[in-house]
Amino acid sequence: MQYLLSKLGDSLQFKFYNKDQTATAKYHCSKPRVDNLLFVNIPKCATQTIAAWAAQMATRDGKIEVPYRFTILREPYGRLKSAFAYGVGAKYQYKFTVEDIGNWFLGKQLPDKFSPNQVDLLVHFVPQHEFIANAPIEIEHYFNTGDMRQLRHILSALSGIDINWMQENTSRYSTQFTIEYNKWFSLNENYIHSYLQKDIRLYKDIFL
């Protein structure tokens, strides 16, 4: 997948194919804002869970005394599959298919102009290492999506409140989606592996 990126304040701005069309990805969990909670947001990496916990801290007057700079990574192949499932789902009114998304990912059969929903979806396929390399802060703590219970306990201790457990999203893929995705993956495995290579290395260096 081809894209250009540039920094825009504390965010990244992405341009896909048609350079007149842009999409912006926010870095920090800023709605609601919790002072000293500095989270580098990577799409499809438990961002909704962190936003929900931040909301609890904000409404219950949680306070973090010392800046806590962290991010969450996801196993790259699992993240890619999750992004496809997200793309074919309710968020985009079930208008996109695995074949559609796969073609855009590969740079094939591109529309003359992407819709706002298409551009928004493509942000979820930008590799994780791009968000890390261009982060506006120095990340001190790395977690993966299997560490959410541990992270909840850490944030509870830091903020001085007992953050309620929110069951993170679990991947439940339909049989039809799995068949279609596995077929696409098998046909394009070499390209996918090459595209994810830096993310695979990053994930292994930190967690394995």
Regions found by a protein language model. Give the residues of each.
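General alpha-helical segment detector with a strong preference for membrane-spanning helices
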Residues: 48-50, 79, 203
